[in-house]
Swiss-Prot record:
This is 7-cyano-7-deazaguanine synthase. It catalyses: 7-carboxy-7-deazaguanine + NH4(+) + ATP = 7-cyano-7-deazaguanine + ADP + phosphate + H2O + H(+). The gene is queC. The keyword ATP-binding applies. It comes from Methanoculleus marisnigri (strain ATCC 35101 / DSM 1498 / JR1). Keywords: ATP-binding, Ligase, Metal-binding, Nucleotide-binding, Zinc. Its EC number is 6.3.4.20. Zn(2+) binds at C188, C196, C199, C202.
Length: 222
C-alpha cells in the first residue's frame, strides 16, 4: 500500500486532509508539530485522537521551539493579541507565523524520505491565500521543485494539496461524506477549553457548518 506523511495539527482542515489521504489509498504517518502555540496542548490531544481514529501507522511529534524565539506572531507571543474577526481584511494577520510552512514541509519531506513515503499531504486551502503567503499555490509549486532537486530520485515525494482550490464549506462537506469526527478537532487560536468563537479561525469554522445547515459539534464560549 502507498504511504504518505500527513501534516496533522488536530484542526478541521488537516483532519479532513488525513481522511482524504486514507480514502485515496494511503497508509498514514501522522506528523504533528508543537511550536509554542497558545493551544499547543489541545492541538496535541486532538491530533493524537484523530491519528488513533485513523489507525495511522505512526504518530510523530516534533517540537519547533525556535518559533517562540523568532516571535512576531500572536500564536506564539502572548504579548500580541489574537484579533477578533472583523470581516475580510487585507494584509497579513497577526496569527501568521513567519515562513512556518517552509519549516513544516522541509521536516515532513525529511520524514517522508526516511520512511520511503511517496507523498506529503498539507491542508492549504483557498481562504488561506490572502493573508498567509506560504499557503499560495505558487509557493507549494516552488517547494515541490526544491523537493525534487534535494531528495533521492526514488520514490519521488509529491506534495499533495487536495484543498488548494476548495473553500472551508467544500472541505467540511467532503469530510462529512468521509465520516470525519469533527468533535475530535480544534480550530480556535486562543482557547483550549471552549473555543472562543470570535477569532477568525472560529468564525470560518462555524460559518462552514452553518452554511451546510449544521451545528458545529464543539462547544463555544461566545
Amino acid at each position: 500500500m502507498k504511504k504518505a506523511v500527513c501534516l496533522l495539527s488536530g484542526g478541521m482542515d488537516s483532519t479532513t486532509l488525513a481522511y482524504v489521504a486514507k480514502d485515496t489509498g494511503y497508509d498514514i504517518v501522522a506528523l504533528h508539530f508543537t511550536y509554542g502555540q497558545r493551544t499547543e496542548a489541545k492541538e496535541r490531544e486532538c491530533a493524537r485522537a484523530v491519528a488513533k481514529n485513523l489507525d495511522a501507522l505512526d504518530f510523530v511529534e516534533i517540537s519547533l521551539e525556535h518559533f517562540t524565539k523568532i516571535g512576531a506572531s500572536s500564536l506564539t507571543d502572548t504579548s500580541i493579541p489574537v484579533e477578533e474577526y472583523a470581516g475580510e481584511e487585507e494584509g497579513v494577520p497577526s496569527t501568521y507565523v513567519p515562513f512556518r510552512n517552509a519549516n513544516l514541509l522541509a521536516i515532513a519531506t525529511s520524514l517522508a524520505e526516511a520512511r520511503r513515503a511517496e507523498a506529503v499531504f498539507i491542508g492549504v486551502q483557498t481562504g488561506d491565500y490572502p493573508g498567509y503567503p506560504d499557503c499560495r499555490p505558487e509557493f507549494i509549486e516552488a517547494f515541490q521543485r526544491a523537493v525534487d532537486l534535494g531528495t533521492a530520485a526514488e520514490p519521488r515525494i509529491v506534495l499533495m494539496t487536495p484543498f488548494v482550490r476548495m473553500s472551508k464549506v467544500d472541505i467540511v462537506r467532503k469530510g462529512l461524506a468521509l465520516g470525519v469526527p469533527y468533535e475530535l478537532t480544534w480550530s480556535c487560536y486562543q482557547n483550549d477549553d471552549r473555543a472562543c468563537g470570535v477569532c477568525s479561525s472560529c468564525h470560518y469554522r462555524r460559518e462552514a457548518f452553518r452554511e451546510l445547515g449544521l451545528e458545529d459539534p464543539i462547544e463555544y464560549e461566545r
